[in-house]
């Protein structure tokens, strides 16, 4: 019965995930306006009053705090990206400066009301939520700013394990989109391959099952598995990895070797071979074996020089005309080797023969 309920929770949770993405542009544009306006207030305060003490400012700012002169200075930077230190909170809104300026022009009187009479209030809440009704407070959604799931039960939104669709906007369904490992309308159940570690009125804590478990489990160790995935076998100690490479039928193609992995295995080519388009292991002419102590072209030159020295020694010793001819041939060969032999001109077969 409990498994049936869990399955239903998963299905319901999956349905709740399929929600239209909310851009919430009007609300975010309003908050962009507020942010640039607030930066303007800070900038003018720094320019004219560097005291930093609220009581001092109330006493000494005089009429400038709500003067038309200051408002004009503030409005010069409103709706400009350059007014903010970064735009991270407003990414993805096309033509945000134009849209912000449109809001500013449309609601100029409301913004002036805030400046002259409402500066003691939070501007974002007063303007965007209460007056223009473009946003909702955090934890609320929709046209009437209804509470997101969880708040009515004095818990966090979606019991702290998900996000509320439309949170903070005048849009959305209010359904919870659960974090990985959680499911259900309120994200109060553990998803498949997760188990319930603890539960309180504030929510549930779920942890992932052991990697060898198939489906539900009771703890994070392999002993908590009720069934095992392919590549694992159920033992007294729980799910244990199966070494498929012990099976002679694994990796039977020519030049293949079996490599055991956790829960599976893979077939790789022996050293000096590589897979072709048909996944067969073929001789790799480009394979790089252990490099010799001396480059191959230098080896050939050393052989040529050594041969020359040996021949000259015999020529001097015997004084034979034939050896004089061989000496001449060797000198010509040595010159050709020195001029034309390099790693690019040496055939692949010769490289492999010399271990290069």
UniProtKB/Swiss-Prot annotation:
GO cellular component: endoplasmic reticulum lumen; endoplasmic reticulum membrane
Glycosylated residue positions: 122, 247
Tissues where this protein is expressed: Isoforms a: Widely expressed in tissues including body wall muscles, neurons, pharynx, hypodermis, seam cells, intestine and gonad. Isoform b: Widely expressed in tissues including body wall muscles, neurons, pharynx, hypodermis, seam cells, intestine and gonad.
Molecular function GO terms recorded: calcium ion binding; protein disulfide isomerase activity
Alphabetical keyword list: Calcium, Disulfide bond, EGF-like domain, Endoplasmic reticulum, Glycoprotein, Isomerase, Membrane, Redox-active center, Repeat, Signal, Transmembrane, Transmembrane helix
Location of the EGF-like domain: 150-188, 241-282
Database matches in CDD domains: EGF_CA
Signal sequence segment: 1-17
A single GO BP: IRE1-mediated unfolded protein response
EC number: 5.3.4.1
Disulfide links within the chain: 27-30, 158-176, 178-187, 245-258, 251-267, 269-281
Result for mutant: residue 30 to A: In kr302; substrate-trapping mutant. Reduced sensitivity to the nicotinic acetylcholine receptor (nAChR) agonist levamisole
Residue ranges that the UniProt entry lists as topological domain Cytoplasmic: 318-321
CXXC, short sequence motif: residues: 27-30
Subunit-structure text: Interacts with unc-29.
Role summary: Protein disulfide isomerase which associates with the unc-29 subunit of levamisole-sensitive nicotinic acetylcholine receptors (L-nAChR) to promote L-nAChR assembly in the endoplasmic reticulum at neuromuscular junctions.
PANTHER family for this protein: EGF-LIKE DOMAIN-CONTAINING PROTEIN, FIBRILLIN-RELATED
Protein name, per record: Protein disulfide isomerase crld-1
Species for this entry: Caenorhabditis elegans
Lineage, uppermost ranks: Eukaryota, Metazoa, Ecdysozoa, Nematoda, Chromadorea
Gene: crld-1
């Amino acid at each position: 019965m409990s498994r049936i309920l869990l399955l239903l929770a998963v299905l319901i949770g999956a349905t709740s995930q399929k929600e239209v993405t909310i851009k919430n542009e009007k609300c975010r544009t309003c908050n962009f306006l507020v942010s640039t306006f607030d930066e303007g207030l800070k900038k003018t305060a720094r320019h004219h009053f560097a005291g930093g003490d609220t009581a001092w400012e109330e006493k000494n700012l005089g009429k400038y705090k709500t003067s038309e002169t200051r408002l004009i200075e503030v409005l010069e930077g409103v709706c400009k990206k350059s007014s903010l230190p970064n735009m991270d909170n407003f990414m993805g809104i096309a033509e945000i400066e134009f849209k912000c300026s449109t809001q500013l022009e449309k609601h100029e009187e409301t913004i002036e009301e805030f400046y002259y009479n409402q500066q003691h209030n939070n501007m974002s809440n007063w303007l965007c939520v209460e007056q223009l009704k473009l946003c909702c407070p955090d934890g609320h959604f929709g046209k009437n700013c209804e509470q997101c799931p969880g708040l009515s039960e004095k818990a966090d939104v979606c019991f702290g394990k998900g996000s509320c669709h439309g949170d903070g906007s005048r849009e959305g369904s209010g359904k919870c989109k659960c974090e990985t490992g959680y499911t259900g309308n309120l994200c109060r159940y553990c998803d498949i391959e997760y188990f319930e570690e603890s539960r309180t009125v504030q929510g549930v804590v779920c942890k992932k099952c052991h990697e060898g478990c198939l489906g539900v489990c009771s703890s994070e160790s392999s002993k908590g598995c009720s069934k095992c995935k392919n590549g694992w076998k159920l033992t007294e100690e729980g799910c244990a990895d199966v070494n498929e490479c012990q099976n002679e039928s694994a990796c039977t193609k020519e030049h293949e070797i079996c490599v055991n992995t956790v829960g599976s295995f893979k077939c790789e080519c022996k050293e000096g071979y590589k897979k072709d388009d048909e996944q067969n292991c073929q001789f790799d002419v480009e394979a790089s074996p252990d490099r010799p102590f001396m480059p191959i072209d230098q080896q050939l030159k050393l052989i040529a020089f050594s041969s020359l020295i040996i021949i000259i020694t015999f020529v001097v010793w015997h004084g034979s005309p034939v050896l004089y001819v061989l000496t001449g041939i060797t000198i010509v060969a040595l010159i050709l080797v020195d001029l034309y032999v390099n790693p690019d001109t040496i055939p692949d077969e010769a490289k492999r023969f010399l271990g290069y």
